[in-house]
C-alpha cells in the first residue's frame, strides 16, 4: 500500500465565533479531561508513585502516565500481535538508506478512506485492536518514514537500536487513535540509534477535518541512544490526549513544538491536555520554540530532566504549562511487579502460545483472560517534592497570545515548575493584553526565579492598559518552601494600569518605573523577608510591601494625577530603609502628588530631597530617621509649597536638615536632633519656626570642627545678617525641649549648664563667616570679621583694629534663648569691637614656633562665660589643635605629656594619637583621657606597642612553620641515621652470606664482614614508609606557643652504581600562640613538604635537602582596656618559607661499625615571608599591609654519635651550632590608620641545637621510633623544643 510522498501540511480551519453556538456539542473526551486535571497533574506534582517508592520512574512516570493515557479504563489488549523480523540483508550496509514503510511495514499495515472525516487513514492489519512488532535490532543504515498520515492504531513497536530513523523526509507523519466504545490508546514506540525529524509530526490528531470520529489517546515514544533532533520547519503537534516520551542522551528540537493544538472549529470551547516526558534524557533538553494552547485553555505538562532550555515559550491567554523537575538524586526504579500484573508480561506469555509461519510473520492469538482478576497498581499519595539542587529550567523569552474575547476578571496564563532554578533570559516577557484584562503567572513551587529581560505589554516596554482591563504580571518563588528568591536583573517599566505582584522569601529588583501615568499596583506583600529595589519611580502607585531596602525612591506627579498619591498600603514593619528619596516638582497645586504610608514601626532615610507641590505623609509610621540630609531638592524650580508630615522624626548624627518657609514640615509627635545640624534659611528677614507637636530633644557632643575649631553646631542660621533687627526669631517650639551632652553622658530639661553648652552650638553665619564670634590672628581675619558683622571700617582699615590680633571677640549684639519650650535668637544689630571694650579672650602662643592659633576647645576661664556655666567655646593652648598634646593641655594635665614621652616614647604617643584623635576626634579623646590616669595610659600603651611589634615581627608570623620544620629536621636525621647502618649482629639468611664468601680471600675479618653486611635488612627491605606524631613549643617570656601534628614520608636505600638514600615527606601541624596578657591569640594551619638524600663515598657522607612550607594564620586582638578597645579585631594572613641545605660529614667507625662518630659542616639558605593582613574590623584602626620577606644564609657545624645494636635498633645524638652570616629582605609596615609598625629583627642570629633519638623493633618489619630536639637562639634567648613518636614499615 502506497503512502503519500509529497510535501504538504494539513490545513487547519480558523476558529469562527459565529459558529460557537452551532458547535458547542463538539468537545474533547470529558472523562479524560477531568482525570488529567484532578489526578494526573496533581499526581505528578504531588509525587504519586506505585509500590513502595515515591518519585520513581516506573511509579511516578510509568504508572501515572499510563493512567493518563488510558483515562480510567481497562488496559488495552491486542486481539492479534503481528511480528516482523528484518533479515540479515539489513545488517550489511551502514551507509544505505531504506524506506521503512515499503521495506518492512507495508505488509502488515492496511489503509482506507474514512468517509466521516473525508480522509485516508492507516491501521495495523485486521484492525486497530491489533499490534505490530518489528524486530530490527541488528539492522544498520538510515530508515525513512514519510507520509504515514493518520495512523489510527493499534500499537506499533519498532526496535532498530543500531540504525538511524528519519521521520518526514518528503512528508510528515501523524499517529492518532481510533475512538470506539473501548476508548483504545494507540502506542507507537521507535527505538533507534539516532532519530531525525524533518517534517511535521502529529500526535492524537483527528483524521481529516475532525468533524467525524474523535480521537481517544495516543502515546508516541522516541528512544535514541545518541540523540533526537528536529529541523526548524519540522513542527511537532500534540493534540488533546497526546503524550510524547523522549529518551536519549540529548534532545534538540529546532522546530515549533505545539502542545494543545486545535484541529476543528469550536475546539477552543473546552481545554486540552497533553504531556511531554523527558525524564529519561540524560543531557540537556532544548526546545527552540514551544507553544501551549491554540485559542483554548490548554493544560500541558513536561516531566523534565535536570536541564531544560526553551528558546521562546508562547502561551495562550488561558493556557497553563507545568514543568516538573526530578527530585534530588533523580527518579528511582521501583521494585518489579509480579508478572501476572503487567501487560508486558502478558505479551511475553503470548509469545509462548504463538506459532510461526513460513513468511517469518507470527500471528498470535491472545490467551483467554476472562477468568483473571486484574489488580491495578497501588496509588500512594505524598506531598509535593522539590526539584534537585542542580535542576534548571531556562526560557529565553515568554510570550502570551490573546484574542478579543471578553470575560469578567479577564484571562490568566500560567507557567509552573518545581526546579531549583527558573531562569528567564534577556528576551524577557511579553504580555498581550485585551479588553477585560490579561494576566500571566510564573510560579516556582520550590525554587528561585530569575528574570534577565524586560517586561513588555503588547510588545512595548512601558506598554499600558486601560481602566478595567489591567495587565498583570505575577511571580511566585518558593511557594511551598517559603524560601525562594525572585530576582529581576533588568529595569522594569510599567505603563498605566499595569500591575506587578511578587511572592517570595526575598525579592531583588534592579529598577521599577511606574511613573508613566500611574495607577499601578506593586504587590510585594507576599515577600516574607526583604524586598531590595535599586531604584523605584512612582506616580499614583499602590505599593504593598513590608521590610524593604530601596536605594532610590523618585516620586513623580507628571501633571496628570490630581491629588493622587503613591500609597504604601501595607505596614512597612521595622526594617525598612530608603537610601535616597526624591520628590519631583509638581506643576501647580491642582496637579500635586506625593507619597503616603499606611503604617509601620520605623523608616530610615539617608537623603531626602523634597520639592514644591509634592507631599510626603509618614504620620502613620511611628519613627522616621534621617541619617544624612533633608533638603530642598530642585534648583531654579518655581517656588511652591512642599508638605512633609511625620509622627516622630529623628535627625541622625552628622545629618543636615535644610529648613525654610517652603518646607512646611509637620511633626505631630516628638523630634530628636541627635547631633545633626538644622540649617535655617532667612527669607524676607525671617526664619520659619519648626513646630513640634510634643517633645523635642537636642543631643550634642564635644566634637570640634577641625577646620574652624568650633563645636559642630546643632542649629545654623545662614544669611543671618538679613534677619529683622530688634525682633525675636523663634527657631523651634515644642511642649517640652530637653538638652543632652552625649560626650559627658548628661541630659536634662532645665539644666543651665547644658543649655549654655547648647547655645555655643547655635551659630549665625554671614556667608561662610561666623557672626556671633570672631577669631583674629592677622589682618585678614580682621577683614573677615568686618565682613561678617557688616563693619566696613574693619574691611577697609584693618590696621586700626590690630589690637584684636591674638584675641577671640564675641558679638554681644546677638542674644540666644534656649529653655524648656523655645529656642530663639534676638538680633539687635552687630556690636563694634573697641580696644578696651572687653568681650575678648587672648589666643595662646605655640612656644615652638611663636605662632598664634585659632583652634577652639573647652576651658572654664573665658571672661564672657557665665560663672556657673560649663566650659565654653574659646581659643586654646600652645599645641596645634588636633594633636593629643592639645587635649592633655586642655585637661590641665600638661605634665602628663612629659610622662607619656618618658615612659612610652614617640611610638606610644603616636599610637595614642591614632586611637583617640585620628580615629575619632578631640571630644572623644578628652572623654577617654579624663577617665584614665597617666600611669594607666602609659601602661596600656606599652602593652599595645609590645603586642603590635610582636604582630609585625616576621619571626612571630613564621614561628609555627619554624617549629614544624624543626620537628621534621629531627625526623629526617633519624631516618638518615637508620639507613646509614653498616652493622648487624644476626644473619637471618646465613646460607646466602656463606655462598657469597665461597672462593674468596680476605686480608682481615673486617673485609669479610663487608660482604656479610650486604645482606643486612636495609638491603633486603630497602624501602620504608614512616609516620610520626609531632609536638613542639616555644620557650620565651612573651607568651605561650605550641604545635602538634603529624608527619609522614617514604624513603629507600639505593645500592647500585651510587650508594645513596632518597626520600620525601609531608607534614601538617596546628600551631597556637597566646601572649601573657592574653591580648593576642593566634591559630594557624601549617603544612611542610620536601625531599632529602644522602650519598655515600666510602666513609664520606654528602647530605642534600629541600623543603617548602605554608601556613594560614587566624589571629585576634582582645584588649580589655577601654583605651585600647578599638584595636580589638580578628585578622588573617599567610606565612611561607622555602629552604635548601647541603652538608658534608666523615664517619669514624668503631666496634665493627656499631659506634660511629661523625663531624660535619654545612651551609643552608632560608626564605621566609608573609602576606598582608586582612582584618574584619570596620574601625579606622583595622590592621592593613604588613607583608614582609627575608632571605637568610647560614653555616653550621655539628658532631653526631650513632650507636647501632641488633639488626635494626639504634640510638643517636647530634649537637651543633648554626650561624647566620648574611640576611636581607623587605617589609611593608603594618598600618593602623595613621600609625605604622615597622618590623625589626636581630642583625645576625646564632643558634645552638641538640637532638637525640632511636628506634626499636616491635614486630617483623614494624618499628617504633622516638626523638627529641632543642634549639636555642643565643641572641634573643628564645628556645624551641620538639619531639616525635612514630612508626616505620619496611618492604
From Swiss-Prot:
Q: Which InterPro entries match?
A: Autotransporte_beta, Autotransporte_beta_dom_sf, OM_autotransptr_brl_dom, Vacuolating_cytotoxin
Q: Which UniProt keywords apply?
A: Cell outer membrane, Membrane, Periplasm, Secreted, Signal, Toxin, Transmembrane, Transmembrane beta strand, Virulence
Source species, domain of life: Bacteria
What GO molecular function annotation could you give as one example from this UniProt entry?
toxin activity
Extent of Polar residues compositional bias: 338-347, 354-374
Region of interest (Disordered), ranges = 326-374
GO cellular-component terms in the record?
cell outer membrane; cell surface; extracellular region; periplasmic space
| Signal sequence interval, chain numbering | 1-33
Please give one Pfam family short name. Answer: VacA
The answer to whether UniProt assigns keyword Secreted to this entry is yes
The Autotransporter domain extends over 1018-1291
Job of this protein:
Induces vacuolation of eukaryotic cells. Causes ulceration and gastric lesions.
Task: Supply the NCBIfam families for this chain.
Answer: autotrans_barl (TIGR01414)
Domain comment, in the record's words?
The signal peptide, cleaved at the inner membrane, guides the autotransporter protein to the periplasmic space. Then, insertion of the C-terminal translocator domain in the outer membrane forms a hydrophilic pore for the translocation of the passenger domain to the bacterial cell surface, with subsequent cleavage.
Protein name (database record):
Vacuolating cytotoxin autotransporter
